[in-house]
Structures are given as structure tokens and as C-alpha cells.
Amino acid sequence: MSEYLLLLISTVLVNNFVLVKFLGLCPFMGVSSKLESAIGMSMATTFVLTLASVLSYLVNQYLLLPFELGYLRTMSFILVIAVVVQFTEMLVQKTSASLYRALGIYLPLITTNCAVLGVALLNISEKHNFIESAIYGFGAAVGFSLVLILFSAMRERLAAADVPLPFRGGAIAMITAGLMSLAFMGFTGLVK
């Protein structure tokens, strides 16, 4: 049980997919200007990332490995992710039309979010079992959500701040992301 907790903590804080592995930077920079959009994107990504992790594990274990189709792994994972994202998009559209409009193009872009595919592929390369795959996917999603929401809150404050002209917009956002990454480096010794 403790190894599962360590896997979750290390995935969320120590090996954060955005700040350490630099995966998922497109939605990180694109959706983080408003807190409401960031929270919606976080919920959608958490659902997609966790479900895609589990389904990718099942496809790999029960379809690709028995039939020796390992060379189709990346393509099949992309297909699994696309199906999960389409399902999520339909679910969000039915349950919250305002969130669906707020997320706009970023919801279908979860399909091309490299963090989702990265987690699925890392689950296989690190030889996680079913439970570890689910925890790893959920931890990656929680880490992504944590960073996205924190960064979004900081960007909203920066929009109201008196930032020098050359640093406005993307420049101050990149500086803030770098400082945030340095802050997360403090968790490095937390899990061995």
C-alpha cells in the first residue's frame, strides 16, 4: 500500500509531467489565462488521463502482447485516447454547455496532448501493473491539474499587476513557469 502512495506522491510532486518532464505544455500555456477555464480543463484532463491510462494498459496486456503487435502500440494508444476524448467531449457538452464553450478548441486538443500519450507509454516502459497504471495516470492528471490551476491563478494576478512592458504576456508567463518549476524542485528529495 505504501508503494502506491509513494507512486502517487512522486507522480504529482516530484516528477510532475509539466514542470519536470515538459509534457502538456500546450494546454498549460493556452488555457491558463483564466482560472475557470483552467479548472474545467483540469477536470477534463484528469478524467481523460486516468481513463486512457487504464484502457491503454488493458489494450496492451490483452490485445497487443498476446498477438505480438507491439509495433502498433503508439497508434493503438492514440486511438484509445481519441475515443476517450470524444466520450469526454460529449459528456461535457451534455452536462455543462458553458464549460464546453469556455474550453473551446482545447477540449479536442486533449487528444494531441503529449502528456496523455506520454503517460500511456511510460506505464508500459516502467512495467506498471493495472493498479499502478491507474495510480500513475491519476497522479499525472492531479499533478497537471495542480500546476495548471496554480499557474492560472498566478497569471490572473499578473494580468492586474504593473508588469514592465517588455515582460507582458508570454514573457512573464514563461518566467513565472520557470520559477514555479524551481519551487517544485524542492520536492526532489521527498521520495527516493
Curated annotation (Swiss-Prot):
Its EC number is 7.-.-.-. Pfam families: Rnf-Nqr (PF02508). One of its GO terms (biological process) is electron transport chain. It is a multi-pass membrane protein. Signal peptide: none annotated. The chain crosses the membrane at residues 5-25, 39-59, 65-85, 102-122, 134-154, 171-191. It is found in: Cell inner membrane. GO terms for cellular component: plasma membrane. The keyword Transmembrane applies. The keyword tRNA processing does not apply. InterPro entries: Ion_transpt_RnfA/RsxA (IPR011293), NqrDE/RnfAE (IPR003667), NqrDE/RnfAE_oxidrdctase (IPR050133). Keywords: Cell inner membrane, Cell membrane, Electron transport, Membrane, Translocase, Transmembrane, Transmembrane helix, Transport. The complex is composed of six subunits: RnfA, RnfB, RnfC, RnfD, RnfE and RnfG. Part of a membrane-bound complex that couples electron transfer with translocation of ions across the membrane. Belongs to the NqrDE/RnfAE family. This is Ion-translocating oxidoreductase complex subunit A. It comes from Shewanella sediminis (strain HAW-EB3). The lineage of its organism: Bacteria, Pseudomonadati, Pseudomonadota, Gammaproteobacteria, Alteromonadales. The gene is rnfA.
